[in-house]
């Protein structure tokens, strides 16, 4: 009886172990499928990671290209600044040249104005000298006229004196004639007295008359000569007076002309003085303008110098920056080229790997799809297996409880029942055992079919994945347990052995 109990316990333990092994196999198959799913998900994550790395490399390449463009833009900007610097320098140079040209023109204009002013001053001096000469000539002519008038007046006075003397002499002669007549009368009166005295007086009278005639003739001739001379002198005086009048009129006309010319010259002088003042004002304005221009030119030169220094400094700094940037750009281009080469090699490798991975992923995807299509009909079975496993686990727990209860009750029965009852109970247990064996054989056949399906699916999956795992039939081959059929069937135990 003890051997039967131990055999039943061993059988229950064997069945329980087989059931647990079956559950473990189902769990391993489910875990393997989950592992395959996780591997495929990991492969997809790796593919996404590779895509992200490719995208990062593309972004890095775009950043390097944009940085290269920025360097090119900075180079173009520096060239524009240099061109602007050159334009500013050329503009300042042109402005300085134009200002110097304007200053040269203004200087030449100022020289021309000064020359014209000097010519005007010379003309004014010449006009003043001509006017002075004309004044001196007029004064000389006036003096000559006055001296000539004085000479004429003195000659007229002399002639008048001579004529007066002649007239006085003529009056004296007439008076003498009257006296002579009186004397003749007296002589005639005295003739009577004395004949000698009369004759003497007559002779004397005759002599006196002859002398008087001579003197009268001389006086008459002198008077005629004086009259002729007076007439000539008067004619000459008239001619001279006419000439003087003509000369005076011409001189007056010339004086008027000279006055007009003088007025004109004075006006010209005034205009020239005004023009000189204007020129002086223009000169002052030009000098102030020149000073302003010189100041502006100086400021421009200073600003140009400052700008040139600033531009040189900026240019040198920009050139240094450009040199540094070019060196950095060269270094970065070299690094970038090396990195590009490395990245290109990596990209080539990655592209090759990605291509291989893509091909492999496509292959795995196709295999997965095929596997999924193939395992899709079995998914429900796997789910059913999982549910059945859970149910079996639950049933195992319940069976364990029932077994413990049955063991307890069986121990109680064996301890409290008689032999007949024990035999009946053993027969009942045998029937239940045979029934359980038939159920176990059914479950084994189902489990074998499932194992075959799982092994086939696992083989296809391993073949698709190229994975070599342990051989499940060999791993699950337990020669000492379920894989060995009993050579002799179980016999009924001897009920009398107890």
From Swiss-Prot:
Coiled-coil regions, chain positions: none
Superkingdom of source: Eukaryota
Protein's UniProt keywords contain Phosphoprotein: yes
Carbohydrate-modified residues: 262, 302, 483
Region (Required for interaction with FAM83D): 150-331
Subcellular location: Cell surface; Cytoplasm; Cytoplasm, Cytoskeleton, Spindle
Region (Hyaluronic acid-binding): 420-430, 442-451
Keyword annotations of the record: Cytoplasm, Cytoskeleton, Glycoprotein, Hyaluronic acid, Phosphoprotein, Repeat
Phosphothreonine carried by residues: 488
An example Gene Ontology biological process: receptor-mediated endocytosis
InterPro entries: HMMR_C, IHABP
Record-level GO cellular component terms: cell surface; cytoplasm; spindle
UniProt keyword annotation of Repeat present: yes
A molecular function (GO) term: hyaluronic acid binding
Pfam (any one): HMMR_C
Family annotation (PANTHER family): HYALURONAN MEDIATED MOTILITY RECEPTOR
Quaternary context: Interacts with ANKRD26. Interacts with DYNLL1. Interacts with FAM83D/CHICA.
Known function: Receptor for hyaluronic acid (HA). Involved in cell motility. When hyaluronan binds to HMMR, the phosphorylation of a number of proteins, including the PTK2/FAK1 occurs. May also be involved in cellular transformation and metastasis formation, and in regulating extracellular-regulated kinase (ERK) activity. May act as a regulator of adipogenisis.
The protein's name: Hyaluronan-mediated motility receptor
Gene this chain is encoded by: Hmmr
């Amino acid at each position: 009886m003890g051997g039967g109990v131990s055999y039943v316990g061993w059988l229950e333990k064997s069945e329980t172990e087989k059931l647990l092994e079956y559950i473990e196999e189902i769990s391993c198959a489910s875990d393997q499928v989950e592992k395959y799913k996780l591997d495929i998900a990991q492969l997809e994550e790796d593919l996404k990671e590779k895509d992200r790395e490719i995208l990062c490399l593309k972004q890095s390449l775009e950043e390097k290209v944009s940085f290269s463009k920025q360097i090119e833009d900075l180079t173009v900007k520096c060239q524009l600044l240099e061109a602007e610097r050159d334009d500013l320098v050329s503009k300042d140079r042109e402005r300085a040249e134009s200002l110097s040209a304007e200053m040269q023109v203004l200087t030449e204009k100022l020289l021309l104005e000064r020359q014209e002013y000097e010519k005007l001053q010379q003309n004014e001096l010449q006009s003043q000298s001509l006017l002075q000469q004309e004044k001196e000539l007029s004064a000389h002519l006036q003096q000559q006229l006055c001296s000539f008038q004085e000479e004429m007046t003195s000659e007229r006075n002399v002639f008048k004196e001579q004529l007066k003397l002649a007239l006085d002499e003529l009056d004296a002669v007439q008076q003498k004639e009257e006296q002579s007549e009186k004397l003749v009368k007296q002589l005639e009166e005295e003739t009577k007295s004395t004949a000698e005295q009369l004759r003497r007086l007559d002779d004397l009278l005759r002599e006196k008359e002859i002398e008087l005639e001579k003197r009268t003739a001389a006086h008459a001739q002198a008077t005629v000569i004086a009259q002729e001379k007076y007439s000539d002198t008067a004619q000459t005086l008239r001619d001279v007076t006419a000439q003087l009048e003509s000369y005076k009129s011409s001189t007056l006309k010339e004086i008027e002309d000279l006055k007009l010319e003088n007025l004109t010259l004075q006006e010209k002088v005034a205009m020239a003085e005004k023009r000189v003042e204007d020129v002086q004002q223009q000169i002052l304005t030009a000098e102030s303008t020149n000073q302003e221009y010189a100041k502006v030119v100086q400021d421009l030169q200073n600003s140009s110098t400052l700008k040139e220094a600033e531009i040189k400094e900026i240019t040198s700094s920009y050139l240094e920056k450009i040199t540094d940037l070019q060196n950095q750009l060269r270094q970065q281009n070299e690094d970038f080229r090396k990195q590009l080469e490395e990245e290109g090699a990596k990209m080539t490798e990655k592209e090759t790997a990605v291509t291989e991975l893509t091909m492999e992923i496509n292959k795995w995807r196709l295999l997965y799809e095929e596997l999924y299509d193939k395992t899709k009909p079995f998914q429900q079975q796997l789910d059913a297996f999982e549910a059945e496993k859970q149910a079996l686990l639950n049933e195992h727990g319940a069976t364990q409880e029932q077994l413990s209860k049955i063991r307890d009750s069986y121990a109680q029965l064996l301890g409290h029942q008689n032999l007949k009852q024990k035999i009946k109970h053993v027969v009942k247990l045998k029937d239940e055992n045979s029934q359980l064996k038939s159920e176990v054989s059914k479950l084994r056949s189902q489990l074998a079919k499932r194992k075959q399906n799982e092994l086939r699916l696992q083989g296809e999956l391993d073949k698709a994945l190229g994975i070599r795992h342990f051989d499940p039939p060999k791993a699950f081959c337990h020669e000492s347990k379920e894989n060995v059929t009993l050579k002799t069937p179980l016999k009924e135990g001897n009920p009398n052995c107890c």
